[in-house]
């Protein structure tokens, strides 16, 4: 929108504004690189291929962002007011209540993207909205029954036990925002209960590390149970999970590949389409004692989906790698 000339305000929660400052510049850079690659290899139907937006557009967009607090009712246009409520999905996510005056009187529209799971860690339950004249709601899993959370957690713990007993590494491809922080919290719970055998846990994603720091700055938004649990460790994630190490630079990431067993490695991208996880897969997929835990949605055509579907071989960084690890 900004690239096309939008100059109005962009209302969001303060946590969303901070996450945008992490995610959008990287996205703009990727847009530019993909357009340059398409032009160099002449495979785009556009002449020339152009990025949807650039890093410069991102900076202009960030300058338009105006953070507002949950529950704060504010005017957005003549006769139109809005209010953000916690959607409980990721830190800063919001349900939008919108009131507008029209020829048929005042109407209320409620809009939301993803809503959080009632039993998810860290985030509170989604806010309950009492009424609406019009509701627009994301519904990806609207027609599905999921197994209980406890079954999932039990399976997660069992896989970690098997990997530790077998001497292999555990690779967890994870999205930088939301899922990585949930995994660290669950690992912390296991550690505090004396159930985590691994002595090395790596969060090998600069973006996930930055997102985790946003979570820490906004931990007042966590649910009461998570606040109480983390509070017993002084609110410090690395005190809650002492084996945790943040790997910020390339050299530290490369050093992990010398570890052949006993480590849990969390890295992006979540669908294994890029990022540091591809290097870790290259060094571990062919090991029969290694485990890969898929913790998020995997789109068709992605390496992550290929693993879920039982691929016996995967091409990573230009090399065919046999899949002998347990997925």
Q: Where are the model-predicted features located?
A:
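Flexible, active-site-adjacent loop/turn segments at secondary-structure boundaries
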Residues: 28, 72-74, 88, 127, ...
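Short, basic, glycine/proline-bearing loop/turn elements
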Residues: 108-109, 139-145, 237-241, 262-268, ...
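Basic, gly/Ser/Thr/Pro-rich low-complexity segments located predominantly at protein N termini
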Residues: 93, 97, 118, 147, ...
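Generic long, charged, amphipathic alpha-helical segments
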Residues: 307, 314-327
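His/Asp/Glu-rich metal-coordinating catalytic cores
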Residues: 1-182, 188-195, 200
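Hard-cation-handling environments
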Residues: 159-303, 315
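Short, conserved active-site loop motifs that form the nucleotide-linked donor/cofactor pocket
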Residues: 65, 80, 244-245, 263, ...
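Solvent-exposed alpha-helices and their adjacent loops that cap or buttress functional pockets
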Residues: 102-104, 126-129, 194, 256-259, ...
């Amino acid at each position: 929108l900004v690239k096309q000339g939008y100059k109005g305000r962009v209302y969001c929660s303060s946590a969303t504004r901070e996450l945008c400052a992490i995610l959008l510049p990287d996205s703009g850079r990727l847009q530019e690189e993909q357009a340059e690659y398409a032009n160099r290899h002449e495979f785009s139907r556009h002449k020339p291929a152009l990025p949807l937006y650039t890093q410069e557009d991102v900076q202009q967009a960030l300058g338009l962002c105006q953070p507002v607090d949950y529950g704060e009712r504010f005017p957005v246009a003549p006769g139109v007011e809005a209010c953000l409520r916690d959607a409980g999905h990721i830190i800063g996510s919001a349900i939008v209540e919108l009131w507008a005056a029209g020829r048929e009187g005042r109407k209320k529209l409620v809009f939301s993207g993803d809503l959080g799971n009632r039993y998810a860690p860290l985030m509170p339950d989604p806010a309950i909205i009492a009424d609406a004249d019009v509701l627009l709601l994301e519904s990806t899993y609207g027609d599905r029954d999921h197994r209980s959370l406890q079954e999932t957690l039990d399976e997660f713990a069992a896989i970690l036990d098997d990997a530790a007993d077998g001497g292999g590494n555990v690779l967890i491809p994870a999205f930088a925002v939301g899922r990585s922080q949930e995994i660290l919290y669950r690992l912390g719970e296991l550690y505090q209960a004396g159930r985590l055998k691994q002595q090395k846990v790596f969060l090998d994603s600069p973006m996930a590390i930055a997102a985790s720091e946003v979570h820490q700055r906004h931990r007042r938004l966590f649910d009461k149970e998570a606040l109480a649990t983390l509070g017993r460790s002084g609110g410090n994630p690395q005190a809650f999970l002492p084996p945790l190490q943040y790997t910020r630079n390339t050299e530290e990431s490369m050093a992990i590949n010398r570890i052949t067993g006993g480590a849990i490695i969390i890295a992006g991208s979540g669908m294994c389409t890029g990022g540091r996880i591809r290097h870790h897969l290259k060094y571990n997929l062919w090991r029969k004692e290694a485990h890969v835990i898929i913790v998020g949605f995997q789109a068709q055509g992605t390496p992550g989906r290929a693993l879920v579907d039982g691929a016996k071989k995967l091409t990573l960084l230009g090399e065919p790698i046999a899949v002998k690890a347990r997925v």
